[in-house]
Amino acid sequence: MDVNGRVAVITGGASGIGRGMARAFAGAGMRLVLADLDEAMLAATVDELGEAGTEVIGQRCDVSRLEDVEALAAAAVERFGAVHVLCNNAGVGIPTPTHNIRLEDWKWMIDVDLWGPIYGVKTFLPIMEEQGEGHINTTASVAGLIGGGFMGAYNVAKHGAVGLMTTLERDLRGRKSPVHASVLCPGPINTDISRHSVGYRPSRRSPKANSAAEGRAGANVQAALDNGMDPDEVGRLVLDGVLTDRFWLFTHGWTVKLLTRQLDALAADGSLSKG
């Protein structure tokens, strides 16, 4: 897809991977609609890109609410007349072992990380098909392919997001749709997703570790993020995926190696991993 002058909608666009996407798309000449719940950060990112010459607007949006996603689409079409790229990027996640996750946290993470992309596809796909072109990308995770420990609800939601996008792409190709799909499965990226997520939890407080092992696991997750890939690099990867209509977008080369080990274990003895 030629993206110069086209319109991209990015949820979770105020910071992290979403802001990296926005910067990459702006550099390619796209017009942008950024959505986020953090209105102060959203305004700062819109100002940054606008001052650099990008046509950009911001909209507060809770992707777990269908009416918010529909309002986002309406705002994009009203301002720019079309939507060519949708990035379902908004997400939340807090390290907690499966047996300790509160039911309200299960619902919260699945509402944002899975229902958010579902609402995005349901709302934006008809717009793109009517205009005759488009690309829908969803930010899943390596956790959507290989379920590690201490991230139960997040892993479940991200597995669902991968399933959504693989099925969508097959459906689109099966009926020769002009719209393409892709899924981003990042490894550790230098974002504040865990710290930011706490402020949006239903209980508005951090989960407490019930053991020293849980405390270390949570600290290890945050340390991996703090030392992770630059989100701007991820944004450039997604832009390239849109330009080339590539489905699988991996940030780290070891992703395929981990998948291969998992499949080898399955074939060998039905276990989760070998070695």
Model-identified regions with their sequence ranges:
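Canonical Rossmann dinucleotide-binding motif of NAD(H)/NADP(H)-dependent dehydrogenases/reductases
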Residues: D2-V33
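Conserved glycine-rich Rossmann-like NAD(P)H-binding loop of the short-chain dehydrogenase/reductase
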Residues: A28-T45
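The beta1-alpha1 cofactor-binding region of Rossmann-like NAD(H)/NADP(H)-dependent oxidoreductases
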Residues: E39-A40, R60-A71, L103
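Substrate-binding pocket helix/loop in short-chain dehydrogenase/reductase
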Residues: P97-T98, R102-K107
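Residue(s) in the substrate-gating loop at a strand-loop-helix junction
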Residues: S141
